[in-house]
């Protein structure tokens, strides 16, 4: 009986091993597929979103200020990983290993580090800019004039390059098969890993935390009228801009904190801590960090009204590159109309098409207006106004930065419209 049981156990053991191995392989394939899906989604949103951010600032003069210069810089840093490192990681995932050679591995690791550190330092620069704008408003124009702002931006990227160069001398850029990436190896040098975490993560985030805490304190004091001596009036736009960048900071900290704290723990006691870290947690911490690069552009669109409006204009211009017809004659947006205005005759239609960026229809107090926006001269011309029951022509022109908001157009022309 003992021999039979022993024989049966011997017969079942290989099958059990194969079953466990098959389960592990299946789980590994499922995890790999999930990582590929997450990375593809991140690349698409990263590229489209950050291009929208850059185009929005370039197109809209309302967004062209010192603070948004660092926002564009942050978008460029986020774009870097989507253009090269993430695609080669995808290749490694599909090939189930690194097949591109050591040169591509080093380039990918360098650009990955450049993007990450550039993002950290740009977020820090944005926080300092917001702090100076709100807490030291009287000196802000001197601190952030055009020349000094470009100097700050250049300094940000110089520090970024200086911070990433030591990786080549330490030899810490290596391929890690668990995450299919050529990245910073946490176990190469404990002292260097601790230095990286402190300089690249803890110190910048401490500076950002200090800046935003001071802003929050000031906002609360002004709101409850504790600071009667505060000269600048905090507008809702200022508060929304501050809130937007604060959310950017919080999400960055949340996405990157697990990876940095794991690296710090491993560096302090590598032989004891490293074997105890589950592989799924290690992989999750990396892909959380990777995912962060696509979030900022989404945050701007959700929380910042100016960016959201410019996103819509850019996307609409892709659908109707010559004219956009927005009908709000019934008090709400009904959609885009692809029909020309009845005011546009055969004689002047070509000229209007040539200089018009978009066509906006609205009705207010029984009047229907067609507004042509001229992007080159930033002018608004109300070329047709129909009153019920009678019709009349009216024109109003003025150099302005208004870009089509209904309230702005009403203010522009309410004081007097010259009859043709």
UniProtKB/Swiss-Prot annotation:
<feature type="topological domain" description="Cytoplasmic">
    <location>
        <begin position="214"/>
        <end position="245"/>
    </location>
</feature>
<dbReference type="GO" id="GO:0008502">
    <property type="term" value="F:melatonin receptor activity"/>
</dbReference>
<dbReference type="GO" id="GO:0004930">
    <property type="term" value="F:G protein-coupled receptor activity"/>
</dbReference>
<protein>
    <recommendedName>
        <fullName>Melatonin receptor type 1C</fullName>
    </recommendedName>
</protein>
<dbReference type="Pfam" id="PF00001">
    <property type="entry name" value="7tm_1"/>
</dbReference>
<keyword id="KW-0472">Membrane</keyword>
<feature type="transmembrane region" description="Helical; Name=7">
    <location>
        <begin position="280"/>
        <end position="303"/>
    </location>
</feature>
<keyword id="KW-1015">Disulfide bond</keyword>
<keyword id="KW-1003">Cell membrane</keyword>
<dbReference type="InterPro" id="IPR017452">
    <property type="entry name" value="GPCR_Rhodpsn_7TM"/>
</dbReference>
<keyword id="KW-0325">Glycoprotein</keyword>
<comment type="similarity">
    <text>Belongs to the G-protein coupled receptor 1 family.</text>
</comment>
<feature type="topological domain" description="Extracellular">
    <location>
        <begin position="95"/>
        <end position="106"/>
    </location>
</feature>
<keyword id="KW-0297">G-protein coupled receptor</keyword>
<feature type="topological domain" description="Extracellular">
    <location>
        <begin position="267"/>
        <end position="279"/>
    </location>
</feature>
<comment type="function">
    <text>High affinity receptor for melatonin. Likely to mediate the potent effects of melatonin on pigment aggregation in melanophores. The activity of this receptor is mediated by pertussis toxin sensitive G proteins that inhibit adenylate cyclase activity.</text>
</comment>
<dbReference type="GO" id="GO:0007186">
    <property type="term" value="P:G protein-coupled receptor signaling pathway"/>
</dbReference>
<feature type="transmembrane region" description="Helical; Name=4">
    <location>
        <begin position="153"/>
        <end position="173"/>
    </location>
</feature>
<feature type="topological domain" description="Cytoplasmic">
    <location>
        <begin position="56"/>
        <end position="73"/>
    </location>
</feature>
<feature type="topological domain" description="Extracellular">
    <location>
        <begin position="174"/>
        <end position="192"/>
    </location>
</feature>
<feature type="transmembrane region" description="Helical; Name=6">
    <location>
        <begin position="246"/>
        <end position="266"/>
    </location>
</feature>
<feature type="transmembrane region" description="Helical; Name=5">
    <location>
        <begin position="193"/>
        <end position="213"/>
    </location>
</feature>
<keyword id="KW-1133">Transmembrane helix</keyword>
<feature type="topological domain" description="Extracellular">
    <location>
        <begin position="1"/>
        <end position="34"/>
    </location>
</feature>
<feature type="topological domain" description="Cytoplasmic">
    <location>
        <begin position="304"/>
        <end position="420"/>
    </location>
</feature>
<feature type="disulfide bond">
    <location>
        <begin position="105"/>
        <end position="182"/>
    </location>
</feature>
<dbReference type="InterPro" id="IPR000025">
    <property type="entry name" value="Melatonin_rcpt"/>
</dbReference>
<keyword id="KW-0807">Transducer</keyword>
<feature type="transmembrane region" description="Helical; Name=2">
    <location>
        <begin position="74"/>
        <end position="94"/>
    </location>
</feature>
<dbReference type="InterPro" id="IPR000276">
    <property type="entry name" value="GPCR_Rhodpsn"/>
</dbReference>
<feature type="topological domain" description="Cytoplasmic">
    <location>
        <begin position="128"/>
        <end position="152"/>
    </location>
</feature>
<feature type="transmembrane region" description="Helical; Name=1">
    <location>
        <begin position="35"/>
        <end position="55"/>
    </location>
</feature>
<dbReference type="InterPro" id="IPR002279">
    <property type="entry name" value="Mel_rcpt_1C"/>
</dbReference>
<dbReference type="GO" id="GO:0005886">
    <property type="term" value="C:plasma membrane"/>
</dbReference>
<feature type="glycosylation site" description="N-linked (GlcNAc...) asparagine">
    <location>
        <position position="5"/>
    </location>
</feature>
<keyword id="KW-0675">Receptor</keyword>
<keyword id="KW-0812">Transmembrane</keyword>
<feature type="transmembrane region" description="Helical; Name=3">
    <location>
        <begin position="107"/>
        <end position="127"/>
    </location>
</feature>
């Amino acid at each position: 009986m003992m021999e039979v049981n022993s024989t049966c156990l011997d017969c079942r053991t290989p099958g059990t091993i194969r079953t466990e191995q098959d389960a592990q392989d299946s789980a590994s394939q499922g995890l790999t597929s999930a990582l590929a899906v997450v990375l593809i989604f991140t690349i698409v949103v990263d590229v489209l979103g950050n291009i929208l951010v850059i185009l929005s600032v370039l197109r809209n003069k309302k967004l062209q200020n010192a603070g948004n210069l660092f926002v564009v810089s942050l978008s460029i840093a986020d774009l870097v990983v989507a253009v090269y490192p993430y695609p080669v990681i995808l290749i490694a995932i599909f090939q189930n290993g690194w097949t591109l050679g050591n040169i591509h591995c080093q380039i990918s690791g360098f650009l990955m580090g450049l993007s990450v550190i550039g993002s950290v330092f740009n977020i820090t620069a944005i926080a300092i800019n917001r702090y100076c704008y709100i807490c030291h408003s009287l000196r802000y124009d001197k601190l952030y004039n055009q020349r000094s702002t470009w100097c700050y931006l250049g300094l940000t990227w110089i520090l970024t390059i200086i911070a990433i160069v030591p990786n080549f001398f330490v030899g810490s850029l290596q391929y890690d098969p668990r995450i299919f990436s050529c990245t910073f190896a946490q176990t190469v040098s404990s002292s260097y890993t601790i230095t990286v975490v402190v300089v690249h993560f803890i110190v910048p985030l401490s500076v950002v935390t200090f800046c935003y805490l001071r802003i929050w304190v000031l906002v609360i004091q002004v709101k409850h009228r504790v600071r009667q001596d505060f000269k600048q009036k905090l507008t809702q736009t200022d508060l929304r801009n501050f809130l937007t960048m604060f959310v950017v900071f919080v999400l960055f900290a949340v996405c990157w904190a697990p990876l940095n704290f794991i690296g710090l723990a491993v560096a302090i006691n590598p032989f004891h801590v490293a074997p105890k870290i589950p592989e799924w947690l290690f992989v999750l911490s990396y892909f959380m960090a990777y995912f962060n690069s696509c979030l900022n552009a989404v945050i701007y669109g959700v929380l910042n009204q100016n960016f959201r409006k410019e996103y819509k204009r850019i996307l609409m211009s892709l659908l109707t590159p010559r004219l956009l017809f927005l009908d709000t004659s019934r008090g709400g947006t009904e959609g885009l109309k692809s029909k020309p205005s009845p005011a546009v005759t055969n004689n002047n239609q070509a000229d209007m098409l040539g200089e018009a960026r978009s066509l906006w229809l609205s009705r207010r107090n029984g009047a229907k207006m067609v507004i042509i926006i001229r992007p080159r001269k930033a002018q608004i011309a109300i070329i047709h106004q129909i009153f019920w029951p009678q019709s009349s022509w009216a024109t109003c022109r003025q150099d302005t930065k208004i870009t089509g908001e209904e309230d702005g157009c009403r203010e522009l022309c309410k004081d007097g419209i010259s009859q043709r």
